[in-house]
């Protein structure tokens, strides 16, 4: 109980090492993190599945070029048998008329041979002849084929739409993958920044704790007053608070990275800070982004889809022509003389008026194309502005890194001079604390500048759908 604050500071300083020994965080290189992301990330899995769906849809549209073959059949029960009825007298009169036309004079010969012919024909007029055609229960099974020959170009344009849908899905997969890569890199370097800050704050607390011991000893020996001792004690209290904040920030950053990667183990990033020797000019970066950006490619694919939809709407003005064939496989109680066993032919369907639906569809498609064109123009403008802002942020971060590296050298030299002066009695503990604080702030600012540079570079590469290049640059320029 003699020095309770010192005991608390020591426990807090050692807490990081104890926690690390218990949890044993997994050292994760940047390349492995990227591989885990591509394997485990659900958003990327969904985009890949969407691509497969679009591919299947494209193949489904190609089926319109082939004939459709189907089997149709049924069992029918009628309320009564179907039969043909006719008057015998009328049939006889018709038969005699046909014979008379074929053999002139036949009627006179028959009247001589059969004097009662007229009476017989009159008697037949009272008799009705009934011929059964189809019985009450009927069963039939047919095979039918339909092969469209001409559709006005609908199949051609539908095939183009299928290809564009597949292309759109591929661009969407690229967009999602690059967005998730950029998010992972931001989370990865945020965790690295948190680790570096935690290590720095741990060392800072250990340093100030040692300085507090020296200040207590000098106070007891009468070399410094109570005010100077309290300055060191307040600095130690602030160091404890900063260390706790650093630990909390590390936990938050670790959870964010684990969520993106889809793993539950605690991670220690092994990637390095790096900075490029030089940046390409902003014009070349903007052109590359406008050529490769996945969002722009998706919009262009949508424009092509709408153009083909308009062509399909125009093709509705033309007739549809198809070949058809039907063959009976099995039939029961269906005579051949009433229903032929096979049929082949060609059919045409031509819509002459549909309530102006075709005209409205063409107008709607044109308006949608205009909307997509406006969106493309606005997206290009937004991408150009974003590229300019990110390029400027990269230049600022690079300039800050160079300046802060010189500031770090000066802060280290200042701290060494203050420590030497404090040991010889020429400097107070307050001056040593100020020098240490300046070094800590410079180190924090340098790490923050490195974080800003790396994350900004990742976001800039993501605009051009080329985030995987970040790994190459990291391996080439890492410090």
Predicted regions and their residues:
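Amphipathic alpha-helical coiled-coil scaffold segments and their short linker/junction regions
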Residues: 34-40, 89-126, 263-326, 467-479
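Acidic, low-complexity, intrinsically disordered peripheral segments
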Residues: 7, 21-23, 70, 77-98, ...
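Hydrophobic, lipid-facing positions within transmembrane beta-strands of outer-membrane proteins
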Residues: 139-145, 285, 342-348
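Amphipathic alpha-helical coiled-coil segments
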Residues: 34, 46-61, 176, 180-199, ...
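Periplasmic alpha-helical coiled-coil/stalk elements that build and connect Gram-negative outer-membrane
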Residues: 28, 56-58, 171-290, 393, ...
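Small/polar (Gly/Ser/Thr/Ala-rich) solvent-exposed segments
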Residues: 45, 68-83, 126-136, 146-175, ...
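Transmembrane beta-barrel architecture of outer-membrane proteins
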Residues: 138-140, 186, 231, 320, ...
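Bacterial Sec-dependent N-terminal signal peptides
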Residues: 1-30
